[in-house]
Swiss-Prot record:
Belongs to the carbohydrate kinase PfkB family. One of its GO terms (molecular function) is kinase activity. This is Uncharacterized sugar kinase YegV. It comes from the Bacteria. Its EC number is 2.7.1.-. Pfam families: PfkB (PF00294). SUPFAM superfamilies: Ribokinase-like. It comes from Escherichia coli (strain K12). Keywords: Kinase, Transferase. One of its GO terms (biological process) is phosphate-containing compound metabolic process.
Length: 321
C-alpha cells in the first residue's frame, strides 16, 4: 500500500513552497569500529571513507535529487575542508548563500559499530560562527519552509539564529534537534517552541523532549500533549516501526519501508529532506512523512550519509512494495 502511494506521490514533487536550508556543511570521516573506545584504550579503526556531509548539506542534496529547489545558507570557509565541500556542492548543482568566510569548515569522526549504530565526535568550524551580516544576506519569502538543525541552535550562535527567526514573518520552521535537544537552554528552547515549528525527533530524542517538557513518554500521549502545549506539528521516527505524525488536523503512524540496514548515518537528515520535499510540493503531512520514510529507508541501506536517492531510484527500489 505504501509503495503504491509512493508511486503516486513522486511524480507530483515540484517546488510550490519556498525552502531555505540554514545549517552546516562539514566533513565526515567514517570508520568501522569493532567497539566504542573506552577510557585509556588504544583501538585500531578501519577507515570507510571521507565524505562531505553535515545535516543541512544532507538535506540540501536530498531536496535537489528529489527535484526541489531550495536556498542553501551553509557557511563555507577558506580552508582544505571548505574547498572539498565547495567542490562537492558544485557537483550536485548547489551553491551556498554564505561563502568565503574566514576560517575553515568543521569535521567529525563517525564510528560505525558492527550493528550499524554510529557515534560522532565533532569539531566546529565556520558553520557555527553565524553573525548578523550573514543573516542580512538571506531573503526569506513569506510562506517559506525554514530548516534548522539542533547543532546550530545549541551552539553559541543559537540565540542569534532564534532572534532572526522571531523577526521573520509567516514562515514555517522545520527543526531537527538531533542529539543536541538536551543542550539547548530552557529559555531559548521556549522561544523556539513559541515559533510553532514542525519538530522531528527520533525515539531517544522524543524521550528527552518528554522529560524536558514534562510530557508523557508514551508516543501517542506525547503527540496529543504536544499539540495541547505547543499547537505545532510533531514527527517521531521509530526506525523499522515507522514514524508517527501529529498535527491539529490529523495524526497517525506511517509504516517503514523494508530494507537491509547497512549503517544509519544520515538517516534522520534524509528523512527530514524527504518530509521537506513533500511539504514544499504541497503534500499533506502524512504523505510527506511517507516520503521521508522512503528516502530514509534508501539511505540506511547504503554506506555513508551522502547517498540520498533520486525520484527514479526510489521508484525502482519500491516498485514491488
Amino acid at each position: 500500500m505504501s509503495g503504491a502511494r509512493l508511486h503516486t506521490l513522486l511524480p507530483e514533487l515540484t517546488t510550490r513552497q519556498s525552502v531555505m536550508v540554514v545549517g552546516a556543511a562539514v566533513i565526515d570521516v567514517i570508520a568501522d569500529a569493532y567497539a566504542l573506545p573506552w577510557r585509556g584504550c588504544d583501538i585500531e579503526l578501519k577507515q570507510q571513507s571521507v565524505n562531505v556531509g553535515g545535516c543541512a548539506l544532507n538535506i540540501a542534496v536530498a531536496l535537489k535529487r528529489l527535484g526541489i529547489e531550495a536556498g542553501n545558507a551553509l557557511p563555507l570557509g577558506q580552508g582544505v575542508w571548505a574547498e572539498m565541500i565547495r567542490n562537492r556542492m558544485a557537483k550536485e548543482g548547489l551553491i551556498s548563500l554564505i561563502d568565503n568566510a574566514e576560517g575553515d569548515n568543521g569535521w567529525c569522526l563517525a564510528l560505525v559499530e558492527p550493528d550499524g549504530e554510529r557515534t560522532f565526535m565533532s569539531f566546529s568550524g565556520v558553520e557555527n560562527q553565524w553573525n548578523r551580516q550573514w543573516l542580512a544576506r538571506l531573503t526569506v519569502a513569506p510562506g517559506s519552509l525554514l530548516y534548522f538543525s539542533g547543532y546550530q541552535l545549541a551552539s553559541p550562535c543559537g540565540e542569534l539564529l532564534v532572534e532572526w527567526l522571531e523577526e521573520l514573518q509567516d514562515v514555517t520552521p522545520f527543526i531537527d534537534f538531533g542529539p543536541r535537544i538536551g543542550d539547548i537552554p530552557d529559555a531559548l528552547l521556549a522561544r523556539i517552541m513559541a515559533c510553532r515549528p514542525l519538530v522531528s525527533l527520533n525515539r531517544q530524542e522524543a524521550e528527552i523532549a518528554a522529560e524536558r517538557f514534562a510530557l508523557s513518554a508514551e508516543i501517542t500521549t506525547l503527540g496529543k500533549q504536544w499539540q495541547e502545549k505547543f499547537a505545532a506539528p510533531l514527527i517521531v521516527r521509530l526506525d523499522k516501526e515507522g514514524a508517527w505524525y501529529f498535527s491539529n488536523d490529523a495524526s497517525g503512524c506511517i509504516p517503514a519501508f523494508p530494507t537491509q540496514v547497512v549503517d544509519t548515518i544520515g538517516a534522520g537528515d534524509s528523512h527530514a529532506g524527504g518530509v521537506l520535499a513533500g511539504l514544499a510540493s504541497g503534500l499533506p503531512l502524512a504523505d510527506a512523512v511517507l516520503l521521508g520514510n522512503a528516502v530514509a529507508s534508501w539511505v540506511v541501506g547504503h554506506r555513508g550519509g551522502d547517498c540520498a536517492p533520486t525520484r527514479e531510484e526510489l521508484l525502482l527500489a519500491h516498485k514491488n512494495v
